[in-house]
Amino acid sequence: MKLRASHLLGISILLICQSVYALDGRLSATLGLDYSSGDYGADQDTDVWATPISLKYRTDTWNIRASTSYLRVTSPNFVTPDGDFIGTGNATATKRVTEEGIGDLNIAGTYNLLDDRKYLVGLDVSAKVKIPTADEDKFLGTGKTDFGLNAEMFQSYGDWSPYWNVGFKWRGDPKGFNLKNVWSSSIGTDYRINDRFNMGVGYDWQQKTTQFSDNAQEASAYVNYKVNDNNKVNFYVLGGFSNASPNWGSGLVLVHYL
């Protein structure tokens, strides 16, 4: 499962694909439940339950978000929830261990350089930091700080809102392991069905982080329901196409505007 800075895939899609401008500033909170499962090239599956939470403050031109999650991971004890191979590297391990605890803290700030209402495309730039609050001894994280930069282009054409982004992440190196700095990219589109419903699809790619792993590749689809002006519900499914991604996953995200 990829607990990326867009933070959980469903949250990322939900927040990216909607062109909502808050002139006076607005605070929102999210709570989710996510499950994913994959073998990551091993003989045994890694199963991850996550309960992500986040707070986001947004104005017309910038936003800042802090997010974390509570994790329950059952795995051969060498794959983190990010799909990084940092344990024994023994892909034939037969014993699975269950660990749980708080995940890493992710903080991201985004600035709108180009307003999509005024220009051919909209352009957002983001800076991100992962603070290692997850227990590395339980393989819930790497125990190191990561930094990232991201640029995203988007525009609305009637009911369609396509987007494309590219990012680079500087990885901290756990002792004894060489995690590579990586490029990543995502492409997708949102479709507005009516005033209450929108749906969309997306594809995510990321360079491999270690010599033992592959490039991560995932496709996803989601449906978003606007309960009222203050509450939204998002349901998503995803499938992976490499040993660095889960075989499949699904989740539910609740968003409340304060």
Regions found by a protein language model. Name each.
Residues A22-D173, V182-G249, V253-L258:
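Transmembrane beta-barrel domains of Gram-negative outer membranes and organellar outer membranes
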